């Protein structure tokens, strides 16, 4: 059942979008009367198109709700509105470019994507549509968003990703740099950090404001302020609640500028200058050093999962509903103390049935995306709900996980993917900036600057 297959990023984007759309009405209320006053006004002209206040209200509401769900600080309304409008401008420019280039997404492709998304959630398309509509998400809106995501994905593939190449020499250099010339003597580093977001493609005014904020925080940190409190109250990274503590990391897992800073710092010291990273500004404090575990400690690692499953195929006298229900019944019996392996040997239609459904240790990329995503969402010992893949319906149980140094080929694959992703992100940012510079954009509300 093992099969290498890349998971389309558009499916993940739509999965996140479905949750945001469901929350839109409640979030929009938080924007107050200002949004209502702008609802029918034009807030931006983008080439020969316009963005209305109503569209801006809806999108800003989604973003505000998403931040609330993540327990992240929500910017003031004017600031949020400006940031969201700039995002919408960039999106609109790309949609126009795609249409001008003749990129079209037919209904069959949209339906296929939605079907795959529904299957990844263990539902039929009708059930998935029903769930979204019950949450207040109009199906027509979700379908339209799916078409836009697919269009922009195809545009990026044509203009950027499809032109990225990674040579064997780059792969070899990457792996060598991960290990380092004296890997056995390398030290793992523990940092605290404060991250202030400022993507390179953000408006220049936003970048300058972010740098000013970061500079002020840096001065406080250098003056002896409690770094942990500063991080908790100001950092925009996911680890802000932990005081920005990154834990011990090998130098290879940290940005090069951060590693360079460590060479000049003693534990407890704050780096005297800001560190510019692609997404913003970093303030870092070296907490501690420790001896690494040797040459292999810095080598690319993979997380392997020991997993077993029960597969029921659809079609051979068994409908979709029957397969799901049978697996749901088996799951209930296993949760009540039944023997998973025994059920697998009796009912599974996979070649692993004779081993009690045991697939052994699975490395990333060795299963179909829907299976891997469900597997990755499980804790050790946990059993999934019935999951649909191209093979049928699965009941998945994770037995344990381990971290291992991959084979030479796996290390090469990891290196190639990391290099390609880094090059693609930079190329995309450059391409998007050029596209924006060649477009006509006029803002109709105050407090918004051009998205340089």
Swiss-Prot record:
Protein name, entry field: Chaperone SurA
Signal peptide bounds: 1-28
Cellular component aspect of the GO annotation: outer membrane-bounded periplasmic space
GO biological process, one term: Gram-negative-bacterium-type cell outer membrane assembly
GO MF terms, alphabetically ordered: peptide binding; peptidyl-prolyl cis-trans isomerase activity; unfolded protein binding
Residue ranges annotated for the PpiC domain, each copy included: 186-288, 302-400
Organism name: Burkholderia lata (strain ATCC 17760 / DSM 23089 / LMG 22485 / NCIMB 9086 / R18194 / 383)
Any Pfam family: SurA_N
Purpose of the protein: Chaperone involved in the correct folding and assembly of outer membrane proteins. Recognizes specific patterns of aromatic residues and the orientation of their side chains, which are found more frequently in integral outer membrane proteins. May act in both early periplasmic and late outer membrane-associated steps of protein maturation.
EC numbers for this chain: 5.2.1.8
């Amino acid at each position: 059942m093992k099969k290498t297959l890349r998971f389309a990023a558009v499916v993940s984007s739509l999965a996140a979008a479905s949750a945001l759309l469901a929350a839109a009405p409640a979030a929009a209320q938080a924007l107050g009367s200002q949004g209502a006053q702008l609802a029918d006004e034009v807030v931006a002209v983008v080439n020969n198109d316009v963005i209305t206040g109503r569209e801006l209200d809806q999108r800003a509401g989604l973003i505000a709700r998403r931040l609330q769900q993540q327990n992240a600080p929500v910017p003031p309304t004017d600031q949020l509105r400006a940031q969201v409008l700039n995002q919408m401008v960039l999106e609109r420019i790309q949609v126009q470019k795609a249409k001008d280039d003749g990129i079209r997404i037919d209904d069959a492709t949209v339906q296929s994507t939605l079907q795959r998304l529904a299957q990844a959630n263990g539902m039929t398309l009708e059930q998935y549509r029903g769930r979204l509509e019950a949450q207040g998400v109009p199906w027509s809106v979700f379908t339209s968003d799916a078409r836009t995501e697919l269009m922009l994905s195809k545009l990026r593939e044509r203009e950027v990703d499809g032109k990225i190449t990674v040579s064997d020499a780059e792969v070899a250099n990457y792996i060598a740099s991960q290990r380092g010339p004296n890997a056995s003597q390398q030290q793992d580093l523990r940092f605290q950090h404060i991250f202030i977001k400022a993507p390179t493609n953000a408006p220049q005014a936003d970048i300058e404001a972010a740098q000013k904020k970061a500079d002020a925080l840096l001065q406080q940190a250098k003056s002896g302020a409690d770094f942990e409190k500063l991080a908790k109250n100001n950092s925009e990274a996911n680890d802000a609640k932990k005081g920005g503590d990154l834990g011990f990391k090998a130098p290879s897992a940290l940005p090069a500028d951060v590693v360079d800073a460590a060479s000049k710092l003693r534990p407890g010291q704050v780096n005297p200058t800001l560190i510019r990273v692609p997404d913003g500004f970093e303030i870092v404090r070296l907490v501690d050093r420790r001896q690494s575990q040797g040459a292999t400690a810095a080598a690319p690692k993979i997380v392997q999962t020991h997993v077993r499953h029960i597969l029921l195929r659809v079609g051979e006298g068994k409908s979709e509903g029957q397969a799901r229900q049978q697996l749901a019944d088996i799951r209930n019996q296993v949760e009540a103390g039944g023997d998973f392996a025994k059920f697998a040997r009796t009912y599974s239609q996979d070649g692993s049935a004779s081993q009690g459904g045991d697939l052994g240790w699975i490395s990333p990329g060795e299963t179909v995306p829907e299976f891997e995503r469900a597997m990755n969402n499980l804790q050790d010992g946990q059993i999934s709900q019935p999951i649909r893949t191209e093979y049928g319906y699965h009941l998945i149980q994770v037995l344990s996980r381990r971290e291992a140094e991959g084979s030479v080929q796996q290390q090469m694959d990891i290196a190639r993917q990391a290099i390609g992703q880094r090059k693609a992100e930079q190329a995309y940012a450059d391409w998007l900036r050029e596209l924006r510079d060649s477009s006509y954009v006029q803002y109709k509300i105050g407090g918004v600057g051009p998205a340089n």
